[in-house]
């Protein structure tokens, strides 16, 4: 893909200050790739030009609306490639010992069902950061990430015969039109995602 546009936004609320004994932070971050030209889509000789004007910029901002040329009749995907995360952190401090502990959780999503708990928040990153009053060891961080649930193992678009919508198989960081959430084969935004560069299979797909 060439000429792709990018929009990023974030918003947070914090209860407490840097000097409070307990601080709670909660918010969300979202980023969208949209517009540009897609080359060799399914082996096509002609490039596919995707709209990237003000309307699509608005769709990218609200993460809703729009479509792309590959949508079937009656099926409209949101414009562009959107990723995001709900982020929460709880920090506790000991003023006397100059110690602090921060427990944090990131729930990442790529569609509306994952963003709004339609199938449960089973994928995400949970971490613990300890700040110690030692010169030789100042900070200890432990993190665990899970990505194998992906809203379940089934994806089914609603049809007149079967109206139920099942929005599983989120396939994190991959996209049907854009070459994944990577830069020169390296994952962006999450160090615990295995980058496509290391697969040595000639693709930019996250597996």
Put a short name on every predicted segment.
Residues 7-9, 14-22, 55-72, 89-93, ...:
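Elongated scaffolding segments in large macromolecular assemblies
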């Amino acid at each position: 893909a060439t000429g792709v546009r990018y929009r990023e936004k974030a918003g947070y609320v914090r209860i407490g200050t840097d000097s409070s004994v307990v601080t709670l932070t909660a918010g969300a971050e979202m980023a969208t790739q949209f517009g540009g030209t897609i080359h060799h889509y399914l082996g096509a000789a002609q490039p596919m030009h995707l709209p990237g004007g003000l309307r699509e910029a608005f769709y990218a901002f609200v993460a809703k609306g729009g479509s792309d040329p590959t949508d079937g009749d009656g099926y409209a995907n949101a414009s562009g490639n959107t990723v995001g995360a709900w982020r929460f952190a709880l920090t506790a401090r000991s003023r006397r010992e100059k110690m602090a502990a921060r427990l944090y959780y990131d729930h990442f999503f790529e569609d509306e069902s994952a963003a709004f708990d339609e199938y449960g928040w089973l994928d995400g990153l949970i971490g613990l950061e300890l700040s110690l009053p030692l010169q030789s060891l100042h900070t200890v961080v432990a993190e665990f990430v899970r990505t194998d649930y992906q809203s379940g193992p089934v994806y089914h678009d609603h049809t007149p015969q079967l109206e139920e919508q099942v929005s599983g198989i989120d396939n994190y960081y991959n996209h049907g039109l854009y070459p994944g959430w990577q830069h020169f084969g390296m994952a962006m935004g999450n160090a615990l995602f295995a980058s496509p560069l290391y697969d040595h299979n000639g693709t930019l797909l996250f597996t």
